[in-house]
């Protein structure tokens, strides 16, 4: 068809050009032009023809039987559509439309049609400007002139193009409109719309306009089923309209989840050639079915997952297996242990000085808990199994630990005092117990390893800051302690003007990568016991698994513990119920089911212990307050470990009466409750490491500690509230004399606080000095050794629940004991500590 049309088409175009015929003179003058070219511009000599085509791109020169000739034929059909001029080339025109076409074609011929005139630009003229490119046309150059545009208008041969399509005007045929030249197609479109379906000019009164184009009303139909789409919904695909049904059947995608069509009205998600319904049920994790809409996802083998755990087929909520639970916690513990060991030598001397000046009983907070261990703890609680004795928290065979000559003052405390210690308000060191009584108490306490769970809650045991024998000797677990566990013991602390080195170890710890918070002791704040039996309802487990999530969310790590503690209230402890899951194994092994422990104590709560310990000094030691110790570069009142006696001539690393003895550096052991020992007994600080597997074997030895109850019921005398009030008046008066500019540290704090808030008047005073002396929250979350009393990496907890005890009941229960001479505690701490304890309920039953 292409080979037949050129001659006919050329005749048609000649008629359109007002019966324009090639001039015979032009053909004769061109010489061999007709033989070489398919078409030559009329009126040119052969050399001018060659000059003209030399200006055009080679691929557009219409040589005979060349690509240029084919291009010319194609452009004739495209630029001069026959159906724009002849009715016979149109389809399905009614009579009115045929008349319209004739009128339209004749009007265009009369007013717009023309052919360009090619001739050399006269040499006598100075030159002209090309209408298209603006370039100069010099004399003698070949130029194209358009009579309809005017005599002075000319173009370079390659610039004689359609204004719309920028294509060379085939055979120089143009249509002039409003100062611009067009090809026949685009000129007709300037006057009438063209149907996108039949490519004919639309002469009807109505048409459909869609996608920026026009259609005859009957022609705008589905490309597949030819359903008229005028006023209907349609979908364009590759420039063709489709009805919704045909499009869904031909092009709709299938959902990879439900294998159903994704309708045109349904949203869809697409990734790497895959498609899903944009719904929570389809675009979700392939393992846990969690919706991934608006969330990142992990593609793997044609499926999408919400996490790496799901992509590996693991349980995203955690596994029952102790091997797979909290692997990240174990990794953090191993890194923490390596860091502590690496900085051991660097911080040993600095921590020695720090510990000799400040020995505050507090416990380390851990953010690492094995869920299975928590479950085993709760099982142990509910079954009221025998408690476990704690293994030594720190102990070094190479570095002995000795106590001073004040150990005999640490053994007796009244229940009021103990409860007040739980309230972090006051504490005191009663005297009156001889040094010889302490070894006997040790023998009674540890001669029989069997202690029941109730004994762990209400028996006699270590004092509030007492170091039990297990703390320093290997092979056994430490006894569990609750709020009532401390009734027979107490602590003492000496204050004096002792030249102790500055706290440079804090800076070394910061530089060495070990936070001071990594040195938090592990003994619980609530290490108190009662001797009376609890009712079954009072022995229900009180752990809380939701505190595990809370503790992990708070970021209590070795690096972040200090920041968290700085945010705590100055006069209140954090919600101790949140700590029940932090290190349940360590905590419950010391205090049964009581969740509040020193592990969750903030820096302010530690300071409140310090303020509490100030009550231990009597008037004889009060004059020492005038000689403050050095804390860093500040002159403040330092504090000595309760078991140490210093004099100015002895180095801070030595103990009185012990040659070559120095204190275990704080990088290897935590600040703990000090216990009274005889002067000649040597203890080795050491932080033991327990393996989780070895702990699990000792879940079977829960009934090994029962006989201590009878042996530990010999308690030192206790004091009553009247002595405490009297001492408080004397103490406050003497403090006002000795420290006139100091605010009252022992003023009673309001009771109208949260049952978990512990009033602390000491925090404001000691805040500037102990802000950087916070305790480690993460350094020993999972110690490793082969000692007993652990199951799957965590100690077996013991149940307990305390109840409110009236003053009469306390006097009745402890009437056999006298109140120590320096008792400074009243009944205020009792109800407050019970309220603290009462608010800790276990959410796992």
UniProtKB/Swiss-Prot annotation:
Residues 18-126 form the PET domain. Residues 318-327 have a biased composition (Polar residues). Its main location: nucleus. The keyword Metal-binding applies. The modification Phosphoserine is found at residues 92, 319, 321-322, 544, 547, 608, 643, 732. Residues 843-845 form a propeptide. It comes from the Eukaryota. Belongs to the prickle / espinas / testin family. This is Prickle-like protein 2. The gene is Prickle2.
């Amino acid at each position: 068809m292409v080979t037949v049309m050129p001659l006919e088409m050329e005749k048609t175009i000649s008629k359109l050009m007002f019966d324009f015929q090639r001039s015979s003179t032009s053909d004769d003058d061109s010489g061999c032009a007709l033989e070489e070219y398919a078409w030559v511009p009329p009126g040119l000599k052969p050399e001018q023809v060659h000059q003209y085509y030399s200006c055009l791109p080679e691929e557009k020169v219409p040589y005979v039987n060349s690509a240029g000739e084919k291009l010319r034929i194609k452009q004739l059909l495209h630029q001069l559509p026959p159906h724009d001029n002849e009715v016979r080339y149109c389809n399905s025109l009614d009579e009115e439309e045929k008349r319209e076409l004739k009128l339209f074609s004749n009007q265009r011929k009369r007013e717009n049609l023309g052919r360009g005139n090619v001739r050399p630009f006269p040499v006598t003229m100075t030159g002209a400007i090309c209408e298209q490119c603006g370039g100069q046309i010099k004399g003698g150059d070949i130029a194209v002139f358009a009579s309809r545009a005017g005599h002075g208008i000319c173009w370079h041969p390659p610039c004689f193009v359609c204004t719309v399509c920028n294509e060379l005007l085939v055979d120089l045929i143009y249509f002039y409109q409003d100062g611009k030249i067009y090809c026949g197609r685009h000129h007709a479109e300037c006057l009438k719309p063209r149907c996108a379906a039949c490519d004919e000019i639309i002469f009807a009164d109505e048409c459909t306009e869609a996608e920026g184009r026009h259609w005859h009303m009957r022609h705008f139909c589905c490309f597949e089923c030819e359903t008229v789409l005028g006023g209907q919904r349609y979908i364009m695909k590759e420039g063709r309209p489709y009805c919704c049904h045909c499009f869904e059947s031909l092009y709709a995608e299938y959902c990879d989840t439900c294998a159903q069509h994704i309708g045109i009205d349904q949203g869809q998600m697409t990734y790497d050639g895959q498609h899903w319904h944009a719904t929570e049920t389809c675009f979700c994790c392939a393992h846990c079915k969690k919706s991934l809409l608006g969330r990142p996802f992990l593609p793997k083998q044609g499926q999408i997952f919400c996490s790496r755990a799901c992509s590996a087929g693991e349980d995203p909520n955690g596994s029952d297996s102790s091997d797979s639970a909290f692997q990240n916690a174990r990794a953090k513990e191993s890194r923490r242990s390596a860091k502590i060991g690496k900085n051991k030598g660097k911080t040993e001397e600095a921590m020695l000085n720090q510990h000799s000046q400040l020995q505050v009983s507090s416990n380390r907070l851990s953010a690492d808990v094995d869920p299975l261990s928590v479950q085993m703890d709760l099982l142990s609680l509910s079954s009221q199994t025998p408690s476990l004795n704690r293994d030594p928290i720190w102990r070094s065979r190479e570095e002995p630990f000795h106590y001073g000559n004040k150990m005999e003052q640490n053994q007796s405390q009244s229940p009021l005092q103990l409860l007040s210690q739980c309230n972090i308000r006051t504490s005191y060191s009663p005297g009156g117990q001889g040094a010889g009584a302490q070894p006997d108490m040790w023998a009674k306490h540890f001669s029989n390893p069997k202690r029941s769970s109730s004994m762990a809650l209400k028996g006699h045991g270590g004092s509030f800051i007492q170091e039990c024998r297990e703390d320093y000797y290997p092979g056994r677990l430490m006894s569990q302690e609750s709020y009532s566990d401390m009734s027979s013991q107490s602590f003492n602390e000496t204050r004096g003007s002792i030249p102790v080195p500055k706290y440079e170890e804090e800076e070394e710890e910061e530089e060495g990568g070990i936070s001071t918070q990594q040195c938090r002791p592990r003994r619980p704040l609530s290490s108190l016991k009662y001797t009376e039996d609890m009712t079954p309802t009072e022995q229900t487990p009180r752990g809380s698994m939701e505190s595990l999530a809370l503790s992990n969310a708070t970021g209590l790590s070795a690096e972040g513990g200090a920041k968290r503690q700085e945010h705590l209230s100055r006069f209140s402890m954090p919600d101790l119920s949140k700590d029940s899951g932090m290190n349940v194994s360590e905590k419950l092994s010391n205090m049964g089911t009581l969740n509040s422990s020193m592990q969750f104590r903030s820096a302010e709560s530690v300071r409140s212990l310090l303020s509490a310990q100030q009550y231990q000094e009597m008037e004889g030691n009060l004059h020492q307050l005038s000689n403050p110790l050095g804390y860093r570069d500040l002159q403040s009142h330092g504090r000595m470990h309760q078991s140490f006696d210093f004099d100015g001539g002895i180095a801070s690393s030595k103990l009185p009466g012990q040659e070559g003895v120095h204190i275990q550096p704080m990088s290897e052991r935590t600040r703990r409750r000090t216990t009274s020992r005889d002067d000649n007994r040597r203890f080795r600080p050491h932080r033991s490491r327990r393996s989780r597997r070895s702990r699990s074997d000792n879940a079977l030895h829960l009934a090994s500690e029962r006989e201590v109850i009878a042996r530990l019921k010999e308690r030192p005398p206790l004091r009553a509230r009247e002595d405490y009030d009297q001492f408080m008046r004397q103490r406050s008066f003497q403090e006002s004399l000795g420290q006139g500019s100091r605010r009252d540290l022992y003023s009673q704090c309001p009771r109208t606080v949260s049952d978990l808030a512990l009033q602390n008047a000491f925090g404001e005073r000691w805040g500037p000095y102990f802000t950087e002396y916070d305790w480690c929250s993460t350094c020993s979350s999972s110690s490793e050794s082969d000692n007993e009393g652990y199951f799957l990496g965590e100690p077996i907890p013991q149940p307990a629940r305390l109840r409110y005890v009236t003053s009469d009941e306390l006097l009745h229960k402890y009437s056999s004991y006298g109140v120590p001479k320096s008792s400074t505690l009243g009944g205020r701490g009792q109800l407050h500590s019970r309220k603290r304890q009462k608010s800790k309920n276990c959410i796992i039953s």
